[in-house]
A protein has these predicted regions:
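Alpha-helical transmembrane bundles and membrane-interface segments of multipass inner-membrane proteins
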Residues: 2-184
């Protein structure tokens, strides 16, 4: 290996290391904010009347959610644990495979936010056997949710937008390797 190749390899490793450090710090910050808001909900909302922020639109209401979104799959902690670990594994695989260039920065950021939301609710499930929800958008009688749910929802919507309007087949080839003309 010549000197130029060694320098390029070292620069690539340094860049990857920087991205990993940024991702860890960003996840820690987002996760910290999620957990802090849930702590505030426990302290100021549990066993207390709702706090109306905008009459008829937005309230803070404490809820211990033992299910998934919209209250489905109540008390299925083992299923949530398996799905979360699987989901995080896929997220970190994609994160690892995405080229560390400005072209793929949106997907890099989305997976940071996605992982933060998944880990935030996972921590609650492991620690308390339920997730603390506290944001109630009652204008449309939407289910009560939390900051981690916002992270997850925005990430999924953004992924669909990126898939539909930003990234093309060449991008997927770049991330996951060449595919045949059949897409296999």
């Amino acid at each position: 290996m010549n000197l130029l190749m060694e320098i390029e390899l070292m620069q690539s490793k340094k860049k990857n290391c920087m991205y990993i450090i940024i991702a860890i710090l960003a996840i820690a910050a987002l996760l910290g904010f999620d957990q802090w808001t849930k702590h505030l909900a426990v302290v100021y909302l549990k066993d207390k009347p709702n706090i109306v922020l905008i009459q008829g639109v937005l309230e803070l209401e404490y809820l211990e959610n033992r299910g998934a979104a919209f209250g489905i799959l109540q008390n299925q902690q083992w299923l949530f644990a398996i799905l979360t670990v699987l989901f995080l594994g896929i997220s970190f695989y994609v994160f690892w495979k995405v080229p560390k260039t400005s072209r793929y920065m949106p997907i890099f950021c989305v997976f940071i936010v996605l992982a933060s939301g998944a880990i935030g609710n996972f921590i609650d499930r492991l620690r308390e056997k339920y997730v603390v929800d506290f944001i109630y958008f009652n204008l449309i009688n939407f289910p009560i949710f939390n900051v981690a749910d916002i992270y997850l929802t925005l990430s999924v919507v953004t992924i669909f937008i990126l898939i539909l309007f930003v990234y093309k087949d060449e991008d997927y080839d770049m991330i996951f390797g060449k595919r045949s003309k059949d897409g296999v």
